[in-house]
Amino acid sequence: MGFPGAYPVSGQTYSRKVDFQVLQVLSGIAQSASKFSSDIRLLSHLKEVDEPFESGQIGSSAMAYKRNPMRSERIASLSRYVICDLQNAAVTASAQWFERTLDDSANRRISIPEAFLATDGILTLYLNVIRGLTVYPKMAEKHLADELPFLATENILMYCVKEKGGDRQALHEAIRQHSVAAGKEIKLNGGRNDLLERILADPIFGLTRAELNKLVDPHAFTGMAVHQTETFLREQVAPVLNKYT
């Protein structure tokens, strides 16, 4: 009949593990999509990105300013369904008797088509969000500037030990105390992060402004990220895109 292959052993139905394997692929798509949607929702909360928002779209009937990431929320909702549907296929496969019964029939007529339909909806939403995503670099820079003083403390500590001959334990304790004080100022009074000013003013560190500025350069914390990203896009993503374009 022209089929490339056949199951070597089969009863009145093929093994329902095949259904599980098919839904496993769809579940994998849903898992990745759900992770993506969660990241977009979190970044949207931080005002670093916005998913597409139509000119006449209303985010809330009561709060006119709202721009909820409703597409990402729908991706998360549908993904949850597809991920859970995989368990349905697993239970069906495990419940087959001897040469297999037909108590799976009505179930799989629902679960398999619905999984494909839901995954199709997920991917449609996924494409819509990606194509219309707005990124706000200045907000990302603001959040980085807020947290960078804390991130830089390890570099400051190591520099002061190696280049200034400082006592590691004493420097570590000084950084801890200044970090706690700066954190309290932020959380209790809504103040700005003044950790770097505290460190600069403390003679135990012996740092100049120029030295401190060099230690908190954001590019010093990215490591191989740029190279890894470019390599991944070139070697992994581009071949797949070229295959389907």
Regions found by a protein language model. Name each.
Residues 48, 65-245:
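Glycine-rich cofactor/substrate-binding loops
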